């Protein structure tokens, strides 16, 4: 008779019977995993200065920070790969050149969505940090109450008529009242911030996955325009005439992303100690629109171009190629689709740097905060 399935992760903490009496690993061949080695030193150090009550959540916040860094790297490298894909296809045949250019646009936008997800993911971590802080603040109250109870028992066992008992019992009443207030705050803040955190977390994952699915759907339609029929030597390839179709797919993808609605009700933004909205590492404002282009008419042909003009809070990227047989030669230069992310440059200063600040300093420690991460905005590749 088979074992009953488990629907709780709590039962997975103990190793299964098949792994309890395993053969010990070889001592002559050892592969050093740098990432795993770093985690072995980093995660246990979280609890060195953290109260016992907040150790588990402090470790979770630390793990989420590592995951956040991974998302940052994925977003940056995906955008670089999209640039390189379009740069490679520029010298290929007309069909591959156009299709690789449009696929590069869609893949680059997926990277922008991942950067946008980093900002929302950081807000999720901020809510977890709030729970961790309240847990750490309640722990001293519990410890003081327990110590006072032990002291009363000791004094009562030695001298039941001691005058210290009256004073200590009065202090115990005050500590019990303070403990009740702290416990009420703990249960209220924990539920409020737990619900807020995972509303943000699940809503962000849903938004990212559905928008990626939209972009992948249009990427598949564009890829289907490529004729991969084998030809014999000397036979010419049919003339490619899918420029207008691929352009329309990009415009439709922009429009569908702009009209997408998140079914999750977005929680109100968190505020700092001054009542101002908490800022994150990435201050991205996603804009998907169709804008007129007048700065590419007199420019030399190149794969990607920056929009001319005064830069306010970031760099406006244009993913439209101006090479041969592209928008400028099809009479569509007035309506040229472009994704316009608004990304902080590396030279700008962020006042409230959420990622890598005091959240990963152990609660109650006086250690030095970890070094802030640099900005990860990829630069387009010019032909």
Swiss-Prot record:
<dbReference type="InterPro" id="IPR027267">
    <property type="entry name" value="AH/BAR_dom_sf"/>
</dbReference>
<feature type="compositionally biased region" description="Low complexity">
    <location>
        <begin position="311"/>
        <end position="324"/>
    </location>
</feature>
<comment type="function">
    <text>Negative regulator of cell wall integrity (CWI) in unstressed cells, probably by inhibiting protein kinase ksg1/ppk21 activity and regulating their downstream CWI pathways pck2-MAP kinase pathway and protein kinase gad8 pathway. Activity may be regulated by the transient increase of sphingolipid long chain bases (LCBs) during heat stress.</text>
</comment>
<dbReference type="GO" id="GO:0036286">
    <property type="term" value="C:eisosome filament"/>
</dbReference>
<feature type="compositionally biased region" description="Polar residues">
    <location>
        <begin position="325"/>
        <end position="336"/>
    </location>
</feature>
<feature type="region of interest" description="Disordered">
    <location>
        <begin position="356"/>
        <end position="383"/>
    </location>
</feature>
<feature type="compositionally biased region" description="Polar residues">
    <location>
        <begin position="368"/>
        <end position="383"/>
    </location>
</feature>
<feature type="modified residue" description="Phosphoserine">
    <location>
        <position position="162"/>
    </location>
</feature>
<dbReference type="GO" id="GO:0008289">
    <property type="term" value="F:lipid binding"/>
</dbReference>
<feature type="region of interest" description="Disordered">
    <location>
        <begin position="292"/>
        <end position="336"/>
    </location>
</feature>
<dbReference type="GO" id="GO:0006897">
    <property type="term" value="P:endocytosis"/>
</dbReference>
<dbReference type="GO" id="GO:0070941">
    <property type="term" value="P:eisosome assembly"/>
</dbReference>
<dbReference type="GO" id="GO:0005886">
    <property type="term" value="C:plasma membrane"/>
</dbReference>
<dbReference type="Pfam" id="PF13805">
    <property type="entry name" value="Pil1"/>
</dbReference>
<protein>
    <recommendedName>
        <fullName>Probable sphingolipid long chain base-responsive protein pil2</fullName>
    </recommendedName>
</protein>
<keyword id="KW-0597">Phosphoprotein</keyword>
<dbReference type="InterPro" id="IPR028245">
    <property type="entry name" value="PIL1/LSP1"/>
</dbReference>
